[in-house]
Curated annotation (Swiss-Prot):
Descriptive protein name: Glycerol-3-phosphate acyltransferase
Function: Catalyzes the transfer of an acyl group from acyl-phosphate (acyl-PO(4)) to glycerol-3-phosphate (G3P) to form lysophosphatidic acid (LPA). This enzyme utilizes acyl-phosphate as fatty acyl donor, but not acyl-CoA or acyl-ACP.
GO biological process: phospholipid biosynthetic process
Species per Swiss-Prot/TrEMBL record: Rhodopseudomonas palustris (strain BisB18)
UniProt KW keywords: Cell inner membrane, Cell membrane, Lipid biosynthesis, Lipid metabolism, Membrane, Phospholipid biosynthesis, Phospholipid metabolism, Transferase, Transmembrane, Transmembrane helix
PANTHER family in the record: GLYCEROL-3-PHOSPHATE ACYLTRANSFERASE-RELATED, INNER MEMBRANE PROTEIN YGIH
Biological pathway: Lipid metabolism; phospholipid metabolism
């Protein structure tokens, strides 16, 4: 089991490291995504290129790589391996080996691993994100609100191990959004649909 757990963590990391935003924008012939807007490789920054289809594809790719990592590990090693794969995929997205450990902020892959581990939690996350986005128009704030509530939701329904895992992922997600939080507090954070 130790071998399977270790392999799940590593494979999860490698899958999580795939930079779909960068790959798709390069294939589409746009400029280097890291030189646009926030410089992030995630779907929100892809949206700033004006390519909504590419942004949606990036969101889907980043989410599904997390889901795939979880489902593969679960089939081979059970729940513990699946959670390790989820952690690996999340860390891989944040710190991809292919991009000198400078990756995305983790929102899509957070949704993806949650979908693989407990799909009702992913639905709750998306509903909370959408509700906040429609009212506040800030992608970062929407993600933070949904991520804060997710571990509480998991704990409430008795999934203590998952609640602990997602509490850790939420702390990492908050850390990755530290600059966004500063801009939110200063009133300078860009709203959804705005180009920087």
């Amino acid at each position: 089991m130790i071998l399977i757990d270790t392999a799940s963590l590593i494979v999860g990391y490698l899958l999580g490291s795939i930079p779909f935003g960068l790959i798709l924008t390069r294939l589409a012939g746009t400029q280097d995504l890291r030189s646009i807007g926030s410089g992030n490789i995630g779907a929100t920054n892809v949206l700033r290129t004006g390519r909504k289809g590419l942004a949606a594809a990036t969101l889907l790719g980043d989410a599904l790589k997390g889901t795939a990592a979880v489902l593969i590990a679960a089939s081979l090693g059970g729940p513990e391996a699946a959670m390790l794969a989820a952690l690996g995929a999340f860390l891989g997205h944040l710190f991809p080996v292919w991009l000198k450990f400078k990756g995305g902020k983790g929102v899509a892959v957070y949704i993806g691993v949650l979908l693989g581990l407990f799909w009702p939690g992913a639905i709750v996350f998306c509903v909370l994100w959408l509700a906040t986005a429609l009212t506040a128009r800030y992608s970062s704030l929407s993600a933070l609100v949904a991520a804060f509530i997710t571990p509480i939701f998991l704990w409430w329904f008795g999934h203590l191990a998952l609640a602990s895992l997602f509490a850790i992922l939420t702390l990492l997600l908050v850390w990755m959004h530290s600059e966004n939080i500063k801009r939110l507090m200063a009133g300078t954070e860009g709203k959804i649909g705005e180009k920087k």
